[in-house]
């Protein structure tokens, strides 16, 4: 026993094998990890960039195809489509102006009480960042939509597809966006296929966009204010909540903007008069494609923004006490324990810090650790399940 005690106290010289060298490795299973600690100017630049892209894609993939976006915005889209149909006695220019005001700007005004709610219940920074996105994306969308000739803006997919798909996409683009496609109409086969492709593209993009907004500390507004509040209160993943809330709102939106508005149009068209007010008109390809898009968005958000997934962090450092004090001064109340280890080469007793943290907090913790010890080893292990109480940072 005395021999081993003396052995542990002795500094062992470790010979590095020939052909080996010490290298720095840094990887993360958290997507966009650098953006979690982004400075405020960069956050606003990215928010406005996302808002411009969002406005353009909404015009191309949603407004012109009869699809719907998600949350409360789908209600304003459905209402705008219904009003456009009801105002058939108005001049075409007036109808389009009213339609675009309702489609884009009404959503901003509906967000006002939700913004107040968010400011009081969630926080100042989150609400301000979200408000910038809501206002910017819808104002940009409105300005683009009133540009002369924007009604004839061709779909983005048209130039990279074959002749048949181009024809289908062109027909889709020129439709009013108010009449749902019919499963029974074989002539619309290519158009229905292109609708699902559009829904997939928008759903995937929207998942990335929403995730980036969450990572930056904001949201897309509307129902997001409510889902974020509920997710933080119940400590649940945002992705699944988004799907259920958006699905419920979407049913109402399609009932107004596609079923009612579409039936009012079809009853004046001889060839399709019998399809008006049919149940099949409600369960149209537009509905299924939009649901598919929502599901895809929720899946992408759950993957890119795993807020309530946890990981175990192990810190192997020679500056243990300083790192410990830095983590404690962070005021996040992380679980923190210190374990003894035995070096496999040196047979020296050392200590390491072990902590359990949410995925989204890992970049922040690593930043704190690196400020103390740039050469320490940080090991991160996924936790598949957890049962018990843990302190969570609320902002």
UniProtKB/Swiss-Prot annotation:
Its main location: membrane. Gene3D superfamilies: 3.30.70.120. It comes from the Bacteria. Keywords: Cell membrane, Membrane, Transmembrane, Transmembrane helix. The keyword Transmembrane helix applies. The chain crosses the membrane at residues 42-62, 67-87, 97-117, 128-148, 196-216, 241-261, 281-301. This is Uncharacterized protein MG443. It comes from Mycoplasma genitalium (strain ATCC 33530 / DSM 19775 / NCTC 10195 / G37).
């Amino acid at each position: 026993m005395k021999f081993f005690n003396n052995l542990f106290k002795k500094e062992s010289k470790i010979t590095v094998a020939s052909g080996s060298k010490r290298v720095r490795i840094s990887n993360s299973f958290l997507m966009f990890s650098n953006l979690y600690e982004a400075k405020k100017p960069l956050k606003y630049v990215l928010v406005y960039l996302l808002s411009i892209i969002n406005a353009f894609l909404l015009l191309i993939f949603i407004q012109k195809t009869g699809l719907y976006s998600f949350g409360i915005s789908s209600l304003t889209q459905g209402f705008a489509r219904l009003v456009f149909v009801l105002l058939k006695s108005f001049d075409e220019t007036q109808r389009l102006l009213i339609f675009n005001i309702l489609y884009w700007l009404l959503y901003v005004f509906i967000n006002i009480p939700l913004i107040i709610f968010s400011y009081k219940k969630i926080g100042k920074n989150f609400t301000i960042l979200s408000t910038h996105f809501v206002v910017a994306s819808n104002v940009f969308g409105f300005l683009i939509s009133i540009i002369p000739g924007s009604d004839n803006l061709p779909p983005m997919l048209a130039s990279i597809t074959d002749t048949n798909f181009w024809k289908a996409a062109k027909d889709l683009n020129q439709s009013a966006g108010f009449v749902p496609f019919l499963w029974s109409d074989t002539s619309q086969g290519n158009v229905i296929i292109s609708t699902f492709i559009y829904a997939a593209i928008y759903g995937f993009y929207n998942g990335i966009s929403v995730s980036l907004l969450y990572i930056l500390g904001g949201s897309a507004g509307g129902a997001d204010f409510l889902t974020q509040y509920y997710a933080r209160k119940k400590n649940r993943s945002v992705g699944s909540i988004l799907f259920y809330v958006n699905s419920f709102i979407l049913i109402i939106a399609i009932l107004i903007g596609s079923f009612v508005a579409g039936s009012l149009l079809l009853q004046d068209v001889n060839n399709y008069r019998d399809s008006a007010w049919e149940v099949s008109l409600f369960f149209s390809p537009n509905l299924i494609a939009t649901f598919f898009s929502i599901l895809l968005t929720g899946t992408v958000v759950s993957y890119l923004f795993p807020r309530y997934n946890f990981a175990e962090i192990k810190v192997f450092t020679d500056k243990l006490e300083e790192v410990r004090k830095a983590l404690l001064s962070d005021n996040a109340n992380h679980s923190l324990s210190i374990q003894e280890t035995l070096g496999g080469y040196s047979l020296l007793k050392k200590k390491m810090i072990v902590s359990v943290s949410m995925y989204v907090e890992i970049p922040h913790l690593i930043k704190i650790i690196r400020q103390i010890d740039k050469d320490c080893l940080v090991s991160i292990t996924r936790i598949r399940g957890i049962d018990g109480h843990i302190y969570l940072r609320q902002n």
